[in-house]
């Protein structure tokens, strides 16, 4: 442990324009699901991600996943195994939500699979892992929010587009979605 005046240890050397958006702890046996803004999901095992030292710069996602031009990872879900009683709630920028059984994404393809069908100009902003009875809250840029139980959205298949989660007006769009626990 550190005493007073401790300075800590530098964990990572970053370039000026780089920043750490998310940090995950995973085993080599864990399944990592990477969701992109275009609605695709890439499935990798932990051992397929390059290991690096404490001060390494890391590896760009485009060098690990076959991403298209302009495509980026917006959400990551890590699990040891796929459970039948768990779900994933997908939320798009235009307010669409989709609830899919977690087990439905236990498919591996090198190029990824389509997890949600998106409308023109829409993009996936978050994926939330739920237990089947969680409350979800959506928030928009103009300060609107809605909270609903995930059971209000029926489970759908992989190719479904989802249902409207929040009504948007003007140029408003969804900026965040999370699980809400009382």
Language model features by range: what are they?
Residues 1-182:
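Short, structured "edge-of-domain" segments at secondary-structure transitions
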């Amino acid at each position: 442990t550190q005493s007073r005046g401790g300075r800590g240890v530098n964990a990572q050397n970053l370039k000026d324009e780089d920043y750490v958006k998310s940090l995950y702890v995973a085993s080599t046996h864990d399944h990592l699901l990477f969701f992109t803004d275009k609605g695709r999901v890439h499935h990798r095992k932990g051992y397929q991600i390059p290991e690096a030292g404490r001060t390494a710069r890391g590896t760009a996602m485009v060098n690990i996943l076959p991403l298209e031009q302009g495509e980026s990872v917006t959400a990551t879900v890590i699990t040891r195994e796929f459970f039948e009683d768990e779900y994933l709630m997908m939320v798009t920028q235009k307010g669409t939500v989709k609830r899919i059984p977690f087990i439905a994404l236990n498919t591996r393809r090198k190029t990824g699979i389509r997890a949600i069908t998106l409308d023109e100009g829409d993009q996936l902003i978050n994926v939330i892992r739920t237990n089947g009875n969680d409350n979800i809250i959506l928030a928009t840029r103009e300060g609107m929010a809605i909270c609903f139980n995930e059971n209000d959205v029926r489970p759908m298949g992989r190719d479904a587009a989802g249902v409207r989660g929040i009504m948007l007006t003007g140029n408003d769009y969804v900026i965040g979605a999370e699980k809400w626990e009382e």
